[in-house]
Swiss-Prot record:
Disulfide bonds join C65-C93, C67-C82, C72-C92. InterPro entries: Alpha-defensin, Alpha-defensin_C, Alpha-defensin_N. It is found in: Secreted. GO terms for cellular component: extracellular space. It comes from the Eukaryota. Belongs to the alpha-defensin family. This is Neutrophil defensin 6. Defensins 6 and 7 have bacteriostatic activity against Gram-positive bacteria S.aureus and L.monocytogenes and Gram-negative bacterium E.coli and antifungal activity against C.neoformans. Defensin 7 has microbicidial activity against Gram-positive bacteria S.aureus and L.monocytogenes. Residues 1-19 form the signal peptide. Residues 20-61 form a propeptide. The lineage of its organism: Eukaryota, Metazoa, Chordata, Craniata, Vertebrata. Keywords: Antibiotic, Antimicrobial, Defensin, Disulfide bond, Fungicide, Secreted, Signal.
Length: 94
């Protein structure tokens, strides 16, 4: 009887720990999916040769990339990773 109580306590503790980690993951995913204050719109423009540009708009075709937490938006494609304030983020380009 004592063994069953100990096993039940261990099982309950394991389930509680797993539920806690699932809740943290869900909270983290919810904050990543919401565009807004975490969205640090770090824009970088690229010409077709891949070099960063500072020219006036309309000079050549450009790619605009932003460093985002979470996933890229619909029209953007994942182009690597970037770092904002020590957090690894997605580099999303159009």
């Amino acid at each position: 009887m004592r063994t069953i109580a100990i096993l039940a306590a261990i099982l309950l503790f394991a389930l509680l720990a797993q539920a806690k980690s699932l809740q943290e993951t869900a909270d983290e995913a919810a904050t990543q999916e919401q565009p807004g204050e975490d969205d640090q719109d770090l824009a970088v423009s690229f010409e077709e040769n891949g070099l960063s540009t500072l020219r006036a708009s309309g000079s050549q075709a450009r790619r605009t990339c932003r460093c985002r937490f979470g996933r890229c938006f619909r029209r953007e494609s994942y182009s690597g990773s970037c770092n904002i304030n020590g957090r690894i983020s997605s580099l999303c380009c159009r």
